[in-house]
Design a protein with these regions (language model features):
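N-terminal accessory targeting/assembly segments
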Residues: 1-106, 110-111
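Extended, highly charged alpha-helical segments
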Residues: 109-173
Length: 173
């Protein structure tokens, strides 16, 4: 008897996060971010905002609110967090360490939408270039093992870290 497979694409369960510094309408911006998330194929499960005079340099959002986000991620089976501001590599790593969930910012979400929609070879290459330019300074800490030793074909010899290999690969592309 033939087995039946579920061919439906599972939508990512997404948590939206924003910091309200008072410089713009956070709810309006989150509404737009929710529409972008749905365009990218995600399902927004929850929103978290925090009023702060400025962004936290380590996590963008305060530690108490970050713990609350981690709890939401566990309870709601969140697959991805999307922040409504630009995040540094350190902020991404710190957020992922606390919440245990893949984290991106608004710009990466928009680039992902372009990547999904690009149909021509030239369009796909342009999107790949844009993604690589955006990811290059954010590579530090991405992935689970960045201290891998090289030494194989195509590396710079023993001791080349995964980070260095990835950066060289992106520059070459």
């Amino acid at each position: 008897m033939a087995e039946m497979f579920d061919n439906t694409i599972k939508k990512d369960r997404v948590l939206l996060a924003a910091v309200d510094t008072g410089s713009y309408d956070v709810e309006l911006s989150l509404d737009e971010l929710e529409e972008l998330t749905e365009t990218a194929g995600g399902e927004v499960i929850a929103r978290v905002t925090q009023k702060r005079p400025s962004f936290d340099s380590g996590t963008c959002i305060g530690s108490g609110r970050l713990e609350e986000m981690a709890e939401i991620c566990r309870n709601e089976n969140i697959d991805r967090i999307v922040f409504d501001c630009e995040l540094t590599a350190t902020q991404i790593r710190n957020i992922e360490d606390v919440c245990g969930v893949f984290t991106i910012d608004r710009t990466m979400l928009i680039l992902d939408i372009f990547a999904q929609r690009a149909t021509t070879r030239e369009g796909r290459l342009q999107v790949e270039i844009a993604q690589n330019k955006y990811r290059l300074p954010r590579l530090a800490g991405m992935g689970t093992n960045m201290s891998r030793l090289g030494g194989g074909i195509g590396t710079r010899g023993p001791g080349e870290s995964k980070l260095e290999t990835d950066k060289r690969h992106i520059r070459t592309r």
